[in-house]
Amino acid sequence: MATIAAASGATGLVMCPLNENKFVDDSPEKAAGLRTALKAIRSILGAHGLKGFVEPLGFPVSSLRLKQEALAAIDDIGGADVYTVVHDTFHHRGAGESRLYPSRTGLVHISGLEDPAISFMDMLDSHRVLVGSKDRLGNVEQLRQLYAGGYDGIVSFEPFAKEVHDLADPIGAVRASIGFVREALERA
């Protein structure tokens, strides 16, 4: 994958943890395994001139839920030159994180959650829609804080909901969502 990414002109690879649909505890073995994996992948990324974007998944069943845990592992292996974290607004809210790491963030993913019947602990990828006025995840505030902290990288959409994929005019919907986010950020 690293060979293909480098050949395509990509600057990095997003790395997501296991999401096994079962609770993964915070054992010393799990922490050691994360560090071992990051060390091994670091040499592969380095050989291809790529960065590693570590994306904790905020689901309760994820083997890596928190950016803080990812950054501790990155620091423990001396990997800050290769690794940054992905700030995903959906997973940030789902994990119940309050701290953002703008200077350690290499990529931002945004998506909205509008259905008031879905709790943050129960939300799934299938609930992720484009960001709009009914957003419950606080996308605009998260972006505002990231920018205020110095983040100046890429922001990309990650709406996985079927209703988004089935839109008659997806380009228009994406443009409307971009417009909403821009206008909301300008109102700061």
Where are these regions (language model features)?
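Alpha-helical packing segments of well-folded alpha/beta enzyme cores
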Residues: 1, 37, 41, 142, ...
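Hydrophobic faces of well-ordered beta-strands that scaffold small-molecule active sites
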Residues: 13-15, 52-54, 83-87, 106-110, ...
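Gly/Pro-rich active-site loop or hairpin
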Residues: 25, 64-67, 91-152, 164-171
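C-terminal helical cap(s) of enzyme catalytic domains, especially alpha/beta-barrels
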Residues: 167-188
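Conserved, mostly hydrophobic/aromatic
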Residues: 5, 52, 70, 88, ...
